[in-house]
């Protein structure tokens, strides 16, 4: 026997609720009124058009939107980005060396740009930037240049007359260079000094003569590597990838950089 509870719903055994509602989102072809019924905490296997219960897994979608969309587009995008990054790293012969080659340069530039956001003053920013620039200079000169493009340079002071001699090494003729790693190496090598030239000009325009010390040191270290590897690539004419990257990309970037001076 049915009875009416305090909330105005008709119920027969205390756990089944019948709700009759009319809404344009639930209209059918035969009637403007549609019945949705369900048993709380149970599975409803009736033949009604729309039936389900809270906790039964059917009829009412409480995790997604009202129209039944799953909303998994964001996870798919992140998964695609992650898989693309992994595939790109697998295509590199020396992924760690390529990452280090970019990491120190990018870290020094970002630290110089956003030092005010981290509450660091000039002294702390100066020390951290010099450390990052020194790590970058050493790693490029001795590690990443040898691994990514098969080139290495160094200079030595002659103890007899005090003259400074430069030495340029290239890999043997059978050494093959990964073209992606070669582009990463040369573009970052020639592109980084352009940012420091812009920072140098900004300090002059804004009369920040204390902060100008960081771009000067950065340019000195970066241009030493640019000169050394440029001479190495010219002496290794058999390496087509290094010759193209250093001659074409390097000269165009150096010409643009010299136009600012």
Swiss-Prot record:
Q: Does the keyword Transmembrane helix apply?
A: yes
> Where is the secretion signal located?
none
Compositional bias segments (type: Polar residues): 20-34
> Is Membrane a UniProt keyword of this protein?
yes
- What biological-process GO terms show up in the record? protein secretion; vesicle-mediated transport
* Compartmental location: Membrane
Can you tell which superkingdom this protein's organism belongs to? Eukaryota
Ranges in coiled-coil conformation: none
Q: Which GO terms describe its cellular component?
A: Golgi membrane
Give the Low complexity compositional bias ranges: 35-51
Keywords assigned by UniProt, alphabetized:
Membrane, Transmembrane, Transmembrane helix
The ranges of region (Disordered) come to: 20-55
Give the way it sits in the membrane: Multi-pass membrane protein
Q: Where are the transmembrane segments?
A: 113-133, 183-200, 204-226
The cross-references to InterPro entries, in alphabetical order and at most eight, read:
TVP23-like
- Family per similarity comment: Belongs to the TVP23 family.
**What is the designated name of this protein?**
Uncharacterized Golgi apparatus membrane protein-like protein 2
